Amino acid sequence: MATPPSSEDSADEGPSNIGEAKFPILEPPLPATICGLAKLLEIPLDDCLIPCNFCGNFLTHLEVCEFDEKKLTLIWKDHLVFACCRVCCSATATYEFNQFYESTVLGRDIEQVTGKSVFDIHVRCYTCMKFLDSIEKLDICGRKRPFYLVRGSWKGICRLCKHFQ
């Protein structure tokens, strides 16, 4: 009669590969917004201290709120997170405009140039980098003010920055 193998017999065969599959560990995607980061960390937005990528200063609570309102994206470097403060955001917008300006289109002509409705065109403020809403884009069209093509993206001026010019 054959005896069943004991645990000692199977130990001679070496380590088992069962359960040791070599699959890459998938990490969850890193949040793109400060609100998303606060939710992931389960902390209030007020407790988020995020340094500016350019000057290193921590964003104020108002700048944290503006960052998400402008629909800007967090910068991740080796699992460290950075954002952009108001001053550096404005400086970056100015630099980008001066270095990468391509063309100017007045008012409703943007629809002819792009082949899209003004409501379907993504436009950021060339001063503060906020995404323009429909009313702001219509205001530019109605007043025959300029839209600028900068680095392949459309720029205009938001209602707040318009008052500082």
Swiss-Prot record:
InterPro entries referenced in this protein's UniProt entry, alphabetically: E6 (IPR001334), E6_sf (IPR038575)
Record keywords, A-Z: Activator, DNA-binding, Early protein, Host cytoplasm, Host nucleus, Host-virus interaction, Inhibition of host innate immune response by virus, Metal-binding, Modulation of host cell apoptosis by virus, Transcription, Transcription regulation, Viral immunoevasion, Zinc, Zinc-finger
Name of a matching Pfam family: E6
Zinc finger region(s), unnamed: 52-88, 125-161
Subcellular location: Host cytoplasm; Host nucleus
Primary subcellular site in the record, as a coarse category: host cell
Domain of life: Viruses
GO BP field: DNA-templated transcription; regulation of DNA-templated transcription; symbiont-mediated perturbation of host apoptosis; symbiont-mediated perturbation of host ubiquitin-like protein modification; symbiont-mediated suppression of host innate immune response; symbiont-mediated suppression of host type I interferon-mediated signaling pathway
Signal peptide: none
GO annotations of cellular component type: host cell cytoplasm; host cell nucleus
Keyword Zinc-finger listed: yes
GO molecular function terms attached to this record: DNA binding; zinc ion binding
Homology family: Belongs to the papillomaviridae E6 protein family.
Function, in words: Plays a major role in the induction and maintenance of cellular transformation. E6 associates with host UBE3A/E6-AP ubiquitin-protein ligase and modulates its activity. Protects host keratinocytes from apoptosis by mediating the degradation of host BAK1. May also inhibit host immune response.
Quaternary structure and partners: Forms homodimers. Interacts with ubiquitin-protein ligase UBE3A/E6-AP; this interaction stimulates UBE3A ubiquitin activity. Interacts with host BAK1.
Name of this protein: Protein E6
Species in which this protein is naturally found: Human papillomavirus 20
